[in-house]
Amino acid sequence: MQLTELIETTVTGLGYELVELERTGRGMLCIYIDQPAGISLEDCEKVTRQLQHVLTVENIDYERLEVSSPGLDRPLKKLADFERFAGSEVSVTLKKPLDGRKTYRGILHAPNGETIGLEFEGKKGEAAMLDFTLADIDKARLIPQVDFRSRK
């Protein structure tokens, strides 16, 4: 079984989604997990303990294991991610330029079949729509919405 499959099976078996897996040259494994309710420290500890056991049993060599949430600027990789975060502000970088541009920032529309929509501000300030598929994307991320105003 491949490392990604092994980790994804373990993570999903615990009720979480594997968002991303990074393996550094120095033997560090970084695992990013999520679930609709968000991720707590206890969730990260639970997944870490289980993965340590599984990686030992499967004799997978690593120096350090780090499990965390994907953060406010979570990457969007699967069609289900684009469905879940429809209505959110995102940044999308395409593999090939479209109208001389590769990076777009706008409001994500729910996928229609394989086609994903992004409403963005066009050249003249008017609303424009970009339609693309997962195959067109180099990377896509949520744009964090943080409100620093105090609540009284």
UniProtKB/Swiss-Prot annotation:
GO biological process, alphabetically ordered: ribosomal small subunit assembly; translation
Main localization (coarse): cytoplasm
Gene Ontology CC annotation, any one: cytosol
Localization annotation: Cytoplasm
InterPro entries: Ribosome_maturation_RimP, RimP_C, RimP_C_sf, RimP_N, RimP_N_sf
Protein function: Required for maturation of 30S ribosomal subunits.
Family: Belongs to the RimP family.
This protein's name: Ribosome maturation factor RimP
